[in-house]
Amino acid sequence: MALNLQDKQAIVAEVSEVAKGALSAVVADSRGVTVDKMTELRKAGREAGVYMRVVRNTLLRRVVEGTQFECLKDTFVGPTLIAYSMEHPGAAARLFKEFAKANAKFEVKAAAFEGELIPASQIDRLATLPTYEEAIARLMATMKEASAGKLVRTLAAVRDAKEAA
């Protein structure tokens, strides 16, 4: 489908606006994936706060120019599906990783986080980042564990002191 200049400008403006507020981006090739499966992926993406769009590579190069996602330029080859994580840096990576497990033809090309290119082989680094709630829960568990351990050691020291006296 041929796009006129206004359509192209509108696409670049829309995706650029999303990219400005995004925490991370993941690029994938979805050739060979059925429409039903892609619809499921898009629905899961909306629920996870992930913006997904298939965009022409030339337009994507304009979108990422001068942004933290410029490192992805070399991955824009063939049909490109780009996903921006809006709420959590690992949301798109986690979504694509799970989808790729169930769909052999879906190929994650690369990701970008804070200006760093993350190759597909290391996408787990981004996908396994804990959410804010998970990080707080881990911190609280560690703090709780530490204070309980300290209390046990203090009580043991008091007991030992009483036994020695």
Curated annotation (Swiss-Prot):
Family membership noted in the UniProt record: Belongs to the universal ribosomal protein uL10 family.
InterPro entries, sorted: Ribosomal_uL10, Ribosomal_uL10-like_sf, Ribosomal_uL10_bac, Ribosomal_uL10_bac_type, Ribosomal_uL10_CS_bac
Purpose: Protein L10 is also a translational repressor protein. It controls the translation of the rplJL-rpoBC operon by binding to its mRNA.
Entry keyword Mitochondrion: no
Keyword match RNA-binding: yes
Record Pfam families: Ribosomal_L10
Organism, as annotated: Salmonella typhimurium (strain LT2 / SGSC1412 / ATCC 700720)
Gene name of the record: rplJ
Name of the protein described by the UniProt record: Large ribosomal subunit protein uL10
Cystine crosslinks: none
PANTHER family: 39S RIBOSOMAL PROTEIN L10, MITOCHONDRIAL
GO molecular function annotations of the record: large ribosomal subunit rRNA binding; structural constituent of ribosome
Gene3D superfamilies, A to Z: 3.30.70.1730, 6.10.250.2350
Annotated GO CC locations: cytosolic large ribosomal subunit
Keywords recorded for this protein, A-Z: Repressor, Ribonucleoprotein, Ribosomal protein, RNA-binding, rRNA-binding, Translation regulation
Assembly and interaction partners: Part of the ribosomal stalk of the 50S ribosomal subunit. The N-terminus interacts with L11 and the large rRNA to form the base of the stalk. The C-terminus forms an elongated spine to which L12 dimers bind in a sequential fashion forming a multimeric L10(L12)X complex.
